Design a protein with these regions (language model features):
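Nucleotide-sugar donor-binding patch of glycosyltransferase catalytic domains
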Residues: 51, 62
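Surface-exposed acidic, glycine/proline-enriched linker/cap segments
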Residues: 1-3
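Left-handed beta-helix
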Residues: 5, 10-11, 16-17, 22-23, ...
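Multi-pass alpha-helical transporter architecture, strongest
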Residues: 54-56
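Conserved catalytic-core motifs of eukaryotic protein kinase domains, centered on the activation segment
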Residues: 25, 59-61
Length: 62
């Protein structure tokens, strides 16, 4: 049994090649998901995330 929860992608989001965004995840505006990442939790706005599972690498906000 899979999950039918929607994936919500904000504005100006970059999802790089080979990334997987799991069901129920919300990706905030301006976020970047690095190549090959597996996103299992919500991504805050303007965060740069990467890895398996994806973790916050840095924030794009000044």
């Amino acid at each position: 049994g899979g999950t039918d929860a929607p994936i919500i992608i904000g504005d100006d989001v970059w999802i790089c090649y080979g990334s997987t965004v799991c069901a129920g995840v919300t990706v905030g505006d301006g976020a970047i998901i690095a190549a090959g990442s597996v996103v299992t939790k919500d991504v805050p706005p303007y965060a740069v995330v990467g890895g398996v599972p994806a973790k916050i690498i840095k924030s794009r906000q000044e």
